[in-house]
């Protein structure tokens, strides 16, 4: 019996929640949004939200505990992505990039070097703001992935 995947979303700063809901509805997949209590809302519209303590890694820990092999994860957190890839999940960035295990070492190294630079007072520009085109690209990539799965 094949297990139906769920979509788990690192929801605190996820800009593509609406697109995720649209694709999940199309493919009849359950979506679980995981966020800290700092993002609590009573207006969850019947969606599956899990709110966790505001501690630094609370949402990550909950997502690690919930994720099963074959699940689809959406997160910008490279560290969380690397752990969940090792569990056999499929991890997407908010921009629709499908992370791959063989790329994680390099991505973690870059993240580490950037953190060291910030400690030294060197700051680089962050990512550009999400555009409608970026949202559409995310939706297209997630849809294509699910069609080919």
From Swiss-Prot:
InterPro entries noted in UniProt: UPF0178
Pfam families, A to Z: DUF188 (PF02639)
Protein family: Belongs to the UPF0178 family.
Signal peptide range in chain numbering: none
Protein species of origin: Listeria monocytogenes serovar 1/2a (strain ATCC BAA-679 / EGD-e)
Entry protein name: UPF0178 protein Lmo1456
């Amino acid at each position: 019996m094949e297990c139906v995947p769920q979509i788990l979303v690192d929801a605190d700063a996820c800009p593509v929640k609406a697109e995720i809901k649209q694709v999940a509805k199309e493919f009849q997949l359950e979506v679980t949004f995981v966020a800290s209590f700092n993002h609590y809302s009573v207006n969850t519209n019947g969606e599956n939200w899990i709110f966790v303590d505001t501690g630094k890694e609370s949402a990550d820990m909950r997502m690690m505990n919930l994720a099963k092999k074959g699940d689809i994860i959406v997160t910008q957190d490279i560290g969380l992505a690397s752990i969940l890839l090792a569990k056999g999940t499929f991890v997407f960035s908010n921009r629709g990039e499908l992370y791959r295990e063989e790329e994680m070492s390099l991505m973690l190294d870059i993240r580490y070097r950037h953190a060291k630079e910030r400690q030294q007072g060197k700051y680089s520009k962050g990512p550009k703001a999400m555009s409608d085109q970026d949202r559409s690209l995310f939706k297209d990539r997630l849809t294509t992935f699910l069609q080919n799965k």
